[in-house]
């Protein structure tokens, strides 16, 4: 089995395919396993993964890599899945580096594809000098005044994570309605994070590093300057599925349409996780785990016609086949 995408769903899929007795390779365009969690949110605390009241992104990825390692999957990192070709009893995927992988079945767990942070309209000259789009390490913000820009889950999660470490945290949003999870909003409102609505960053000042930030009140036009050493722009990102759009897949709202078995309609190609779309779809890490298990189980008879879809329940050291 070839799994395209080494994020949380892909890593769990590698474990589960190994559990079903398959050999597995994972291909990902990023240089490290973990997908968006590793690349953008390694320090963010995740609260909605079963069995973990709270776990940092990096720790979750480490646990998934360890879990998959017992079946020794092959990692093909820093290369994008580019071309798909069919053989009578297999598919061949060619990577952007020319690496050809022949597999009985492919499971696409590519998240949202290649993702690029939406830039802050002003202050891009300070990128890497106090302006960041994600927080790789929390401790570097100790005793700093931090401005977090945005109104979604990432903005609120970063504000909450930085609150006990930074000297001050200010959350700036251009509206008074937020897209973040209601429970997270309540936690931020109950913290010492200052929330400024109807506000935007007008300018960022400083020589080598950020020294102060100029904010504008969008309804009145009033401006004020406050000290800051860091700005976290959590404005979301744009996603691009790249070559996958040329694989003959049925697309639905920039996602891959699948049926209840996670089958894409393209022979020997399944998909799971955030990249998929079906009625009632909810994009969570937790649902991605269930979807990739469904995909692997339904792919098992494609790999081996003698295999059953339902593997039975795991216990002890037994392995399903």
From Swiss-Prot:
Cofactor binding description: Binds 1 FAD per subunit.
GO MF entries: ferredoxin-NADP+ reductase activity; flavin adenine dinucleotide binding; NADP binding
Reactions it catalyzes: 2 reduced [2Fe-2S]-[ferredoxin] + NADP(+) + H(+) = 2 oxidized [2Fe-2S]-[ferredoxin] + NADPH
InterPro entries, per database record: FAD/NAD-bd_sf (IPR036188), FAD/NAD-binding_dom (IPR023753), Fd--NADP_Rdtase_type_2 (IPR022890), Ferredoxin-NADP_redctase_2 (IPR050097)
Enzyme Commission number, as recorded: 1.18.1.2
EC class name: oxidoreductase
Pfam family, one: Pyr_redox_2
Keywords: FAD, Flavoprotein, NADP, Oxidoreductase
Binding site for FAD: 28, 36, 41, 81, 115, 274, 315
RNA-binding is among the record's keywords: no
Keyword Glycoprotein among record annotations: no
Cofactor(s), names only, from the UniProt record: FAD
HAMAP family associated with the record: FENR2
Similarity section: Belongs to the ferredoxin--NADP reductase type 2 family.
PANTHER family the UniProt entry points to: THIOREDOXIN REDUCTASE 1-RELATED-RELATED (PTHR48105)
Assembly mode: Homodimer.
Protein name: Ferredoxin--NADP reductase
Species annotation: Frankia alni (strain DSM 45986 / CECT 9034 / ACN14a)
């Amino acid at each position: 089995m070839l799994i395209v995408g080494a994020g949380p769903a892909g890593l769990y899929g590698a474990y589960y395919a190994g559990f079903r007795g398959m050999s597995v390779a994972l291909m990902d365009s990023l240089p490290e396993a973990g997908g968006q969690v590793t690349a953008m949110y390694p320090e963010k605390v995740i609260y909605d993964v079963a069995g973990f009241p709270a776990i940092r992104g990096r720790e979750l990825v480490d646990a998934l890599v360890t879990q998959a390692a017992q079946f020794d999957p092959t990692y093909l990192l820093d290369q994008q899945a580019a071309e798909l070709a069919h053989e009578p009893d297999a598919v061949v995927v060619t990577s952007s580096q020319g690496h050809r992988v022949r597999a009985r079945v492919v499971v696409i767990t590519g998240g949202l594809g290649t993702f690029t942070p939406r830039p802050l309209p002003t202050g891009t000259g300070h990128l890497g000098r106090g302006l960041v789009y994600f927080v790789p390490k929390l401790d570097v913000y100790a005793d700093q005044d931090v401005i977090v820009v945005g109104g979604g889950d990432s903005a609120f999660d970063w504000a909450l994570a930085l609150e006990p470490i930074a000297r001050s945290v200010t959350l700036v949003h251009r509206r008074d309605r937020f897209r973040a999870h209601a429970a997270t909003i309540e936690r931020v409102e109950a913290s010492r994070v200052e929330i400024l609505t109807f506000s935007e960053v007008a300018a960022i000042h400083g020589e080598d590093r950020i020294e102060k930030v100029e904010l504008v009140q969008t309804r009145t036009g009033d401006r004020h300057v406050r000290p800051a050493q860091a700005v976290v722009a959590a404005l979301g990102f744009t996603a691009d599925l790249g070559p996958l759009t040329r694989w003959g897949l049925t697309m639905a709202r920039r996602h891959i349409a699948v049926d209840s078995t996670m089958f894409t309609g393209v022979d020997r190609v399944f998909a799971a996780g955030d990249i998929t779309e079906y009625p009632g779809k909810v994009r969570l890490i937790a649902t991605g785990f269930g979807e990739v298990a469904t995909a692997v189980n339904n792919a098992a008879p494609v790999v081996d016609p003698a295999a059953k879809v339902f593997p039975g329940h795991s216990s002890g050291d037994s392995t399903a086949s």
